[in-house]
Amino acid sequence: MAGRRDHKRVLIYSHDSFGLGHLRRCRAIAHSLVDTDSSLSVLILSGSPIIGSFDFRSRVDFVRIPGVIKLRNGEYVSLSLHIDIEETLAMRSSIIRHTADIFDPDILIVDKEPLGLRGEVRSTLDLLRARGTPMVLGLRDVMDDPGALETEWERKNAVPALSDYYNEIWVYGLPQICDPLAGIELPASVRRRMVYTGYLRRNVPAAVAAPEVPEMRDGEFLLVTAGGGGDGDELFDWVLAAYERDGGSLPTALLVFGPFMLKLSFTLLPFT
């Protein structure tokens, strides 16, 4: 069991239903942990389809679970498999629990969702709680509008999960910046578990191959990017509409689409 090992293990569940932010944050945390402790290994659970494109340091690895994507109407569907979302979630939940059972972490860090996507982590939380494994919920410093978050967490029964499972709640930021749970009525016992971690310094690689960039008119241009790009088609559509209306007075635009932009969305944009 974990208490009899010389090398410690951390398991991170990465909320991955959309975009790059969750994966990048979990990766940064994992790298910081192994840099701090040479006896530590970190395993990340993620459904991101591009997790294999990232570089991971020694003693950091990942398990890729079947991916899902959130539609505009709020519903989730399987990212690649042509199967029902409930089947996909059942597969994900089983893989997550089995990985936790075998990896037997010294600590579990859950990203954003106290019970995971649609409760898929609950059985894993029950397993590790029975073993006495410390469990942490990690939250970014700015979450959502307080009213919207309160409604969402009430629907997901998230607050009882904080009391039942988590030893600490890590807020990745400073209390002077934001309290992400300001709109949630939390028991005092849960409030006392909140720990503000501060921020990790982002290191830019010393040498990165520069992408090929088209020559810009007069050296000035407008850079338009939507992060991962999964929900960026409306932004790009508005930008292109502005250029169609009065493009002569605007600088040249460079659009960076991101890896999650759907091919169909790309082909429907009104390029001229």
What are these regions (language model features)?
Residues 2-19:
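Nucleotide-activated donor-dependent transferases that construct or modify glycoconjugates
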Residues 7, 14, 32-87, 91-93:
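Conserved nucleotide-sugar phosphate-binding/catalytic loop shared by glycosyltransferases and other
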Residues 14-27, 51, 232-234:
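A short, glycine/small-residue-rich beta-strand->loop->alpha-helix junction that serves as a flexible
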Residues 30, 184-186, 199-272:
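Donor-nucleotide binding loops and adjacent catalytic segments primarily
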Residues 42-47, 137-138, 169-173, 251-258:
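Short internal beta-strands
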Residues 50-52, 108-127:
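An aromatic- and histidine-rich active-site surface loop
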Residues 78-118:
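Conserved nucleotide-sugar donor-binding subdomain of glycosyltransferases
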Residues 125-196:
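Active-site-proximal region of nucleotide-activated glycan assembly enzymes
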